[in-house]
């Protein structure tokens, strides 16, 4: 009985890791490249980010409860200057920008 519970836990863990790591390995996940400006409106944020060369801009909650304009871009392995491993980026968890890795 304990072996069955343990093996189902291992299978579930492996499935979750697969859903997390496969997009990271392939380099096809969207990351936040810049998240430092105060956000007044999403259309204004989007226009600013598009002007700076990012794909999109959104107002997101920051860890301290404020709202920041975050510029989103596609972190692709084809970009020579911004690989997912070497460039700093943020992780969004439930719409909150929480981690700079």
Swiss-Prot record:
Residues passing through the membrane, by range: none
Question: Which stretch is the leader sequence?
Answer: 1-27
Alphabetized Pfam families for the sequence? Defensin
| Main subcellular location of this protein, as a coarse class | secreted
Of the GO CC terms on this record, one is: extracellular region
Keywords on record:
Antimicrobial, Disulfide bond, Fungicide, Plant defense, Secreted, Signal
Q: What is this protein called?
A: Putative defensin-like protein 86
Its organism's taxonomic lineage begins at:
Eukaryota, Viridiplantae, Streptophyta, Embryophyta, Tracheophyta
The gene coding this protein: LCR82
